Amino acid sequence: MASERLADGDSRYYLLKVAHEQFGCAPGELSEDQLQQADRIIGRQRHIEDAVLRSPDAIGVVIPPSQLEEAWAHIASRYESPEALQQALDAQALDAAGMRAMLARELRVEAVLDCVCAGLPEISDTDVSLYYFNHAEQFKVPAQHKAHILVTINEDFPENTREAARTRIETILKRLRGKPERFAEQAMKHSECPTAMQGGLLGEVVPGTLYPELDACLFQMARGELSPVLESPIGFHVLYCESVSPARQLTLEEILPRLRDRLQLRQRKAYQRKWLVCLLQQNATLENLAHG
């Protein structure tokens, strides 16, 4: 049974981590199927970590206390308060000391994997250029537009019934047609979208970001143009196209540093996977010989 397998303290720590990272919930909220899936993930992860920490490459690898403290602070930041973190630990019968110990183990595994990659060559400008020109479609930026004001429909409130909401936004639109430069001011006063505090600014959006009803209008608009009143499932909208950035191809110079980092990371991950496969195969062979 998964619940029996996950009874020890170490596994409870792993369960807390897997539940949040894989399923986005607390361990107690996992279904039986999810719990069994978590059990398989944990078993595989512990098997790999054990192999890594027993490998010759792990000899002499030490985690400095400052790195552990930084990682612990990162975990604590996910919770509203130290008390909330303690409650989460208590719910899984864990304590801070035990969790720190498991965190130190994770960090040491990561450090060993970093050491394994120490001899890898750096990604050269030629490597980056070849990837860029062979995958040019990955570096196309679609057209982007800026916009937005919203009045929601909510029949539970007299001021937000469908008829009242429509009247309000038509009044706003009439006001803006005379002075579109007042868009940000009107958005801050009347918009019920979270973007109101930024003057209704959605930022640069690409097709498919907004509701289809809004997309269909926005990407036909010219710079400085106001839309008619539009309706989506959440209410009425007026769009203002503040600017238009046409679709374009990013240059190699623009993306070279980020692409180099991406390719370097991909190379490291591929090498680590290859190293782990070899390590696990060697361990399996030794176990077979020992039991043969």
Curated annotation (Swiss-Prot):
Keywords: Isomerase, Nitrogen fixation, Rotamase. This is Putative peptidyl-prolyl cis-trans isomerase NifM. Its EC number is 5.2.1.8. GO terms for molecular function: peptidyl-prolyl cis-trans isomerase activity. It catalyses: [protein]-peptidylproline (omega=180) = [protein]-peptidylproline (omega=0). InterPro entries: Nitrogen_fix_NifM (IPR014282), PPIase_dom_sf (IPR046357), PPIase_PpiC (IPR000297), PPIase_PpiC_CS (IPR023058), PrsA_foldase (IPR050245), Trigger_fact/SurA_dom_sf (IPR027304). The keyword Electron transport does not apply. It comes from Azotobacter vinelandii. Belongs to the PpiC/parvulin rotamase family. The gene is nifM. Residues 148-243 form the PpiC domain. The lineage of its organism: Bacteria, Pseudomonadati, Pseudomonadota, Gammaproteobacteria, Pseudomonadales. GO terms for biological process: nitrogen fixation. Gene3D superfamilies: 3.10.50.40. Required for the activation and stabilization of the iron-component (NifH) of nitrogenase. Probable PPIase.
